[in-house]
Amino acid sequence: IQSTSMDQGILTEDSMNSFIRTLIQAGIWKNKVPKQTARTKDGTQTTVKKTEAEADAMVSKDTRLSFQPIVSVDAELLRQQRRFSSPRVLLSENTPLEPPPLYLTEEPTVLNRTSRRKREGKSHRGEYSVCDSESRWVTDKSSAVDIRGHQVTVLGEIRMGPS
């Protein structure tokens, strides 16, 4: 912001408060307009403030450079982070030695929800299942095990409404 000799009169408190509000709203007060050094005709250096447009261009350029999206996570970052115990996720720079237990459908313990109780106490590296599930419809079962471990009968047909 540049001022001329005509603008350098005494300012009242209200006009100063109004001026500060305008600066804050414009974001200039917070960012502080950078100064440039320039030489006058006689060779002495003076400080000249950049124009508002130049300052805005610099601020927007700096903003774009500082907010770049993160594409990948560096292994050094994983080493620096404090290790934590989580039942679902383990951050590691090494790949797991075996696939997670969720995808091992050959095991009979994976087929129902009570298998979570059986898996407790084991430590696995890699992914953990939030819940056990099957990714296909089962149409030919007449009995099943509920979440409490009790044997229940599966209804072949469900009647709705008055009969």
From Swiss-Prot:
InterPro entries: Cystine-knot_cytokine (IPR029034), Nerve_growth_factor-like (IPR020408), Nerve_growth_factor-rel (IPR002072), Neurotrophin-3 (IPR015578), NTF3_N (IPR045815). Keywords: Cleavage on pair of basic residues, Glycoprotein, Growth factor, Secreted, Signal. One of its GO terms (biological process) is cell surface receptor protein tyrosine kinase signaling pathway. PROSITE patterns: NGF_2. Its main location: secreted. Glycans are attached at N112. SUPFAM superfamilies: Cystine-knot cytokines. Residues 1-3 form the signal peptide. One of its GO terms (molecular function) is growth factor activity. GO terms for cellular component: axon; dendrite; extracellular space; synaptic vesicle. It is found in: Secreted. This is Neurotrophin-3.
